[in-house]
Amino acid sequence: MKRSLRALTVLLALAVVSAPDSAYAQKVFKIAAIVPVSGPAAAFGLGCQRGLEMAAEDIGVFTVAGEKYKMEVVTYDTVYAPDKTVAAINRAVYNDSVKYGVIIGAGVHPPILPIIRETGFLDFAFAAAGKQVTNPENPTVFRIMASSDQLYQTYAVAIAGKLGAKRIAFLGPNDELGKNDAKAIKAEAEKMKAKGVSFVGDEYYERGARDFGPALLRLIAQKPDIIDTDGSPTGSIALIAKQARELGYNGYFVNSTAVLEAKAISDIAGKAGENIIALRIWANPPTKLYTELAERHQKKYGEAAPGTLWETYGAARWLVDTITRAGTFDTKKVAGALAGSSYANHPFGPASWGGEKAYGIKRQIVIPIPASILKNGKWEPFDVKSGKFD
């Protein structure tokens, strides 16, 4: 018996000695996915959630100030509704003691910004719009996708020139995002006035709408060459395209801030979905990491990766690198360190922060920005630009 006990003691000691570092990672670093995982914008939220989870897998155990941590993703479904987003961030901060997270939607940000300012929550904003979200009053808000201003300044003139378009119309959601982006594209159209380009009309719809006929009739009467659909999600733009073609529209659609799914558009709109130009979509992979993440997602979930996955993954890896170097989880100290850093390993290519001239603070991600056009149910390359934004 004594011999057996001694043998067991030796085995336990060996097990402790040979245990991997992760066995001692008793502390958890929580990061929130405050995103829609149900409803019409669910694909956006699932991409963010899975991007964070894949980043957590790859980060493994990391050390901050001599303590070992593992990242844990906590998801709060917002259904892309402002009231549910307010409830979600309150639950994350006050109930679950979460200090960091990804939050989707320019339209849901206005009511949560006071909470972010009060608590110092570090928000990776997956949101378009512009100065309403990114400004010196919100030093812990980092936009991890191209802003509306950045996208329109980068592409509005270029697309109109490439297509020879002269008349531009706008159809977007009736919220903070839509109203802001209509102003942005009007400003860009004004820059092209000397070249005969004009902005001919704007219409708005309530999110979740399915009948766009009346708004489209009013816009099509203005004979636009391009209808900009702003951040309309996949299901909405598919219906917009289908209904517009039925009403006789033969021009182009441009989708600036959403991340669209080609197959879903084709399933709904068929050939009517042709000639949708979408920004922020890569027809060809920009990096090896981009391809690896796409393949991992396909293998695990049996479907193509949602378009929000890569930017979220890159932001999470960048954040943990910064926290590790800073040696603290203090969000204000981390925000300062993050703003002064760059990141070479983003899935889209080298990344940094800009926007100081435009927004008064460096909290706008600067990464390569692609544009693709839908042809025969698949994205084809249209253009790639640097995304430089001062």
Task: Set out the residue ranges of the language-model regions.
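N-terminal signal peptide c-region/cleavage motif recognized by signal peptidases
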Residues: 18-20
